[in-house]
Amino acid sequence: MRKEKLITLNDRGNEMTFKIREMPAMKLESWLARAGLLLAGTGAFDGKEVATPGDAIQKAGAMLSQGGISALANIDYEKAQPLLDDLLACCSRVDAGIEQKMTPETVDGIIEDVRTLFALRKEALLLNMGFFMGGESSVIPSDGTPSPEQSKPRISVRSRR
């Protein structure tokens, strides 16, 4: 069974629940290989031994789990966009028990705050790459009553395996 977790985000005063689901193994391997090739093209692995494609995948996973999405900062956006879209595809909005898949085409009709989009991609990355670093979440538990002065979306997590 794929790992998944439910998170609640405050999107400009609206509490929204999202389900983050782990990518299937083959898709994740492909994602890591593409990320590894893009990172290698930026010189990110210079000075680090990469003898096999598996080494590139391991190094890419380690870089992404340590640096998060910022590890992709030196990659042209057009090349990184499919990777970001794949992370978004791991996310669904859950409302009254109904899941709505997040896609580049639907996201603007669901969320308003770009920080919510960043938080979703970050949590999808953590869920998928967490095994490289032990899978510790960086989310802030929500007590269900966010204050209006909060500058960042608040997140609460419920995990199921």
Protein language model features and the residues they cover:
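Short acidic, Pro/Gly- and aromatic-enriched capping/linker segments at domain boundaries
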Residues: 1-10
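Short, surface-exposed, charged amphipathic helix/loop patches that serve as local interaction elements
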Residues: 2, 25-161
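Generic structural motif
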Residues: 10-12, 23-25
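Short linear motifs in exposed loops
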Residues: 19-21
